[in-house]
């Protein structure tokens, strides 16, 4: 399975509008962070290839152009906040070109929020609207021949979804991982986890909290995402443990193909 970081930034992105700090002004492309999202490419046991988005970020059009994305076979949503869903309208072109409805997967409150925000896409079937199907889950499910495990975690007071697919897991916008969820994530080979700031934040792990969770979960390797402009990429890399890295936009990882 191929994992592409479409974006590694927070809701403001980096550079931040109006900010002239050294990170926002940095010429290093690794310090330029679109909103956090992933593209997963896998081939199931039947040889069927799939391109799956994790969240439809506010920057999805730009992200799709960067990686020459020509098809979307599904979307896994972590939660319903603006930086994770407002790019949904960019799915229109994929439905038009391929003549398909794209399945969306998320918790019930996430799907309800999407239906409300994009009600024009569901109240009629007029030309020019996204062609999508809403799907909720209450446990693991099969997505195009692959076993997907949604894992409940906390984003301040709301429950959102992390995901484990084979030996890869994605945990962003998280402030706490309940014990039962930690057991589901334990021993994962590749963990992507959010680390918004250096200081504590009510809705997101800080750097130290993310590092604590990486150790708690006994992840083989970990990649930090949802990084604010407090972090300069090269400096952050130098202070991290050997098995932990700062992700950046365009980074591609390879994981074992997930099984059904």
Indicate residue ranges for each PLM-predicted region.
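Cap/insert and terminal regions of metallo-dependent hydrolase folds
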Residues: 176-257
